[in-house]
Amino acid sequence: MNRVPKGVKKLNFLFEIGLEELPSRYVDEAESNLKKIAEKELKEERIAFSEIESFSTPRRVAIIVKDIAEKQADLDKKSVGPSVEIAYKDGALTKAGEGFIKSQGATPDDVKIIENEKGKYISIEKFIAGKPTKEVLPEILSNVIKKIEFEKSMKWSDRTFRFARPIKWFVTLLGTEVLPFEFEGLKGGNKTRGMRYFAPQDVEISTPDEYVSKLRENSVIARKADRKAEILKSIKENCENDGDVAIINNYLLEEVVNLVEYPFAIKGEFNPDYLDLPEDIITITMETHQRYFPVKDANGRLTNKFIVIRNAPKYSEVVKKGNEKVIEPRLADAKFFFDEDLKGKFADNVEKLKEVTFQKDMGTIYEKMQRSKKI
């Protein structure tokens, strides 16, 4: 919280970075870092605001800075220089004294002598009037973008800048006015974009306050919490008519919520013959490889049904059948390897551990096992 002084005009400021699809694991980090870095930069530049709300989807990260002051706070700055003994010699300024005064953009007449427990020092006191926020924000935004880091980043086109994925657009809206801004050849504006496949057109934003609603009208749910709630609601609606219950793996849920902009749950089925496999093999195959939510019946038994989350605002029979088709070979592979494992004795697998590296320069899993036996 950085309160705006009374009498200072306040506006809301929207900043959105539009991207090619981010990996799911980067989305939360990008949103968090954007908010955290922006907050730090604004405070350092003495720009007051009430709060910052952040947003993210695979194709965008954004913040709305609420009640941002129209200008920087004024600053009374005191800079302490060298000691009097170093700054003066025989009543005249030394090079050290002149250098300090020059570095402060001051004149010898501005020098004051202060005294503390260490002795006497020269100092310069300056009044720095706050600049209009719209003049300071462009540099702040550039710094914010440069300071957002990722585990892996990339260059694209002829850009020298690196980011997790190519940046495609910026929204820079201060109140109802577009803030002039340019970074790596991309200019800020008041147009965002809807969902790539169902609302790919530009979406004009008139004020930051309508950002969330305008995106929703164009098949984008900007808040992660809202997408998660929509996923859980849609899954429940798909299951309750049959008395089924989906298995909600929280790690999978966190991944899926950042894979979609407008989630829609679809229930599919696979060949019930695969239910002869151990339950863990079926669920791991669905969750890890396909990002499906397995489904159990009212008695807690695993069924041949699954829930897939589509990135779309409506149902599609084609998508349902496509996912039903894809899961079959996955389960067939799982069954094949399971059956192969059953053909040999369990003890035979010990020898195979000699072929599996534990860590570089630390031998095999078999050698690790032998070391553990000695402990």
Model-inferred region functions:
Residues 234-238, 352, 374-375:
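A general alpha-helix detector
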Residues 9-11, 49-50, 170, 348-349, ...:
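Non-catalytic regulatory/linker segments of enzymes
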Residues 168, 247-360, 364-370:
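Catalytic nucleotidyl-transfer cores of nucleotide-processing enzymes
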Residues 35, 39, 328, 372-373:
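Structural signal for well-ordered, non-membrane alpha-helices
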